[in-house]
Design a protein with these regions (language model features):
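Feature marking well-ordered beta-strand scaffolds used for ligand recognition
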Residues: 1-166
Length: 166
């Protein structure tokens, strides 16, 4: 592992104050945005939404000194939906909830109306947290738009969200 820019080293006083970096993963070159932790048995998995991309990385963080990317949930075909963004994820009650929408022009270099799937996808983590099973996909009715961005799911029957919808 090369030393990340924020880690304390001989040539760097460190970026994180009052914390110590104990492990690092470049997530196989995929950026991450919101993350959510899931514990099952003795294993810990971190699900990482992508600010620009059609997937959610699954990282085994059971040993925090050696985080390992063990899978990815692809929410749509990146060859079709090249403007896809999956920035927000939530985990509770053995469910992974993923927000889908289009990227932002000034951040991602896409144009309004570029193809992106929309809505929320709900996955079951209980059977196999490395290969989540898609349970449902709620569509906003406005594909290629902003879709769902911030939302809250703490378990139970309801997801609370703002969405561009019809």
């Amino acid at each position: 592992m090369s030393v990340p820019f924020y880690a304390k080293s001989e040539t760097n006083q460190g970026y994180s104050k009052n914390m110590e970096v104990v492990g690092f993963s470049d997530l196989n070159g995929v950026n991450a945005f919101q993350m959510a932790l899931y514990k099952t048995g003795e294993k810990y998995y971190m699900y990482c939404g992508s600010f620009k991309g059609a997937g959610v990385n699954i990282v085994d963080v059971t040993d925090p000194t050696k985080p390992e990317v063990v899978g990815c949930v692809y929410v749509s075909d990146p060859n079709i939906y090249f403007a896809q963004s999956t920035p927000k994820v939530q985990v509770a009650d053995g469910l992974l909830i993923v927000a889908l929408g289009g990227g932002v022009t000034f951040l991602h270099g896409i144009k309004p109306g570029d193809p992106a799937d929309d809505g929320l996808q709900i996955y079951d983590l209980k059977e196999d947290p490395v290969h989540p099973k898609l349970l449902s996909h709620w569509h906003t009715g406005l594909p290629n738009g902003m879709g769902v961005h911030r939302f809250a799911y703490n378990g139970g029957k309801y997801v609370y969200m703002p969405a561009e919808c019809r």
